[in-house]
Amino acid sequence: MPHNTRVFVVFLVLTAILSACSAQGSDSSTNVRVTLTDFGVVSSSTQFTAGIPYTFTITNEGQVPHEFMFIPPVMAGMADMHGEATHNTALIEVNESQLPPGATYVLSYTFPKSVAGTDLEIACHTPGHYEAGMRIPITVR
């Protein structure tokens, strides 16, 4: 193979490699693992920054279906609030049909700047689950 052809082939290969690396690096979301159990929530992170994209991998390791919500904490005396009122206050919701026992759900979410500094929770509001402790406070800066 002539020298010019080899140089051109090497150039093409290097260009392809650099393009592939650049494409992989363009996804700047932060990965967060969330595990739902009967009846608890564990998250690999509870500190978030508004405007930053996150990819949440949510796994239901429990024996019953669960919900996943970013929601303001329930006020005293309102722990049994369910249904439409709860769902209307959630920033995002993954419902029970999407999180049966053993399921994993991947969610991409960016907290809006409007929620920076507010109290939020990751919670399950399936009847009785929130009251059983299925919530964890999170901070959004």
Model-inferred region functions:
Residues 67-71:
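Beta-strand signatures of extracellular beta-sandwich domains
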Residues 1-9:
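Bacterial N-terminal signal peptides that target proteins for export
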Residues 92-141:
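Extracellular/periplasmic metallocenter environments
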Residues 22-24:
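Bacterial signal peptide processing site
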Residues 58-60:
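Asparagine-centered strand-capping/turn motif at beta-strand->loop junctions
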Residues 17-20:
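C-terminal motif of bacterial Sec signal peptides marking the signal peptidase cleavage site
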Residues 27-54:
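N-terminal edge beta-strand
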Residues 74-85:
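Short aromatic-acidic-glycine turn motif
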